[in-house]
Amino acid sequence: MTVDAVRVELGARAYEVRIGPGLIARAGAEIAPLLRRPKVAILTDETVAGLHLDPFRQALAEAGIASSALALPAGEATKGWPQFARAVEWLLEEKVERRDVVVALGGGVIGDLAGFAAAVLRRGVRFVQVPTTLLAQVDSSVGGKTGINTAQGKNLVGAFHQPSLVLADIGVLETLPPRDFRAGYGEVVKYGLLGDADFYEWLEEAGPRLAADTEARQRAVRRSVEMKAEIVARDETEEGDRALLNLGHTFCHALEKATGYSDRLLHGEGVAIGCALAFELSQRLGLCAQEAPSRLRAHLRAMGMKVDLRDIPGDLPSAEALLALMAQDKKVVDGKLRFILARGIGQAFVADDVPGDVVRTLLEDALAQR
């Protein structure tokens, strides 16, 4: 199979997202042209390190590139001040200079944290994303959003800092646990829902075989990245169109906070539930027919995914408390909740005039089904 290259057009800061199998084995040759000296610092997590760090460092060594690595604990809890500070201090101890390159080898947590560390280290060093999860390959590794979570909420501290290169090796997705693969699919399906009905229709047919079909998997990653790249090029810092990428995320972030950023709810699972709620909200507001949320729920169920609040184990707070968590969302403008709603599949738009009582009733109904 060939490697696909999708360019993120940002003028002098443009970069390529390369998608295909075997990219980790060729990482040295891919990264070498970026280097001023043959040395990189790698941030990863303990799970990814056990699977992919040695082959990655071997590929660098074959190209004459020296490397050092720090493996942080795996999981969303790592994406906070303590591990962020640890990563920055380690990069300083490794004497990473402004002209050097930091590599993020891992999923969304590592990509976000390492990218933010690169953004603030010496007021900005370059970094390369090597995403190892489906979610990171189709979403978080592309577009330059970096950051960490705080006690107040998710991604509230961070920076826009674009990578210099993204290497999305679709072969490594075969090592993902099925639950993590399905969670990443929550972000894939989001792209069809927000702006490409044909892609969504293809996913309804191809989705169940993505985990086993390399060609279909590459197509799904490529189309997702193409859509994200187009939107980021138009609106890098989320003043307008880029907000569409947050379809499902206003609900998702509140649910993640309510579940303590734990294994009770993975980010992609929250996105899938959030998309279903956003389409249900759209239907209740008279924006789309009931067929749209029903069709989405049926597809997510067919994929074996979490779809409703009742699919989240353990206790959840009240509708009022969830609304209060949403008010902390970074998408809030002038104190108003901002939702991505839809007039149908592939027809999403930004709305910041959604009546709070309709959202509250939606959440109350969803909680009542638990």
Swiss-Prot record:
Q: Which cofactor does it need?
A: Co(2+); Zn(2+); NAD(+)
Which reaction is this enzyme known to catalyze?
7-phospho-2-dehydro-3-deoxy-D-arabino-heptonate = 3-dehydroquinate + phosphate
Q: Where in the cell is it found?
A: Cytoplasm
In the record, what terms sit under GO molecular function? Answer: 3-dehydroquinate synthase activity; metal ion binding; nucleotide binding
Report whether Transferase shows up as a keyword of the record. no
Recorded GO cellular component terms are: cytoplasm
User: Superkingdom of this entry's organism?
Assistant: Bacteria
Q: From the UniProt record, list the coiled-coil ranges.
A: none
Q: List the disulfide bonds.
A: none
Involved pathway(s): Metabolic intermediate biosynthesis; chorismate biosynthesis; chorismate from D-erythrose 4-phosphate and phosphoenolpyruvate: step 2/7
Q: Could you give a single Gene Ontology term from the biological process aspect?
A: chorismate biosynthetic process
**Which InterPro entries would you find in this protein's record?**
Dehydroquinate_synthase (IPR050071), DHQ_synth_AroB (IPR016037), DHQ_synth_fam (IPR030963), DHQS/DOIS_N (IPR030960), DHQS_C (IPR056179)
HAMAP family in the record = DHQ_synthase (MF_00110)
Q: Which family does it belong to?
A: Belongs to the sugar phosphate cyclases superfamily. Dehydroquinate synthase family.
PANTHER family for this protein:
3-DEHYDROQUINATE SYNTHASE, 3-DEHYDROQUINATE SYNTHASE, CHLOROPLASTIC
Protein name, per record: 3-dehydroquinate synthase
Q: Which species is the source of this protein? A: Cereibacter sphaeroides (strain ATCC 17029 / ATH 2.4.9) (Rhodobacter sphaeroides)
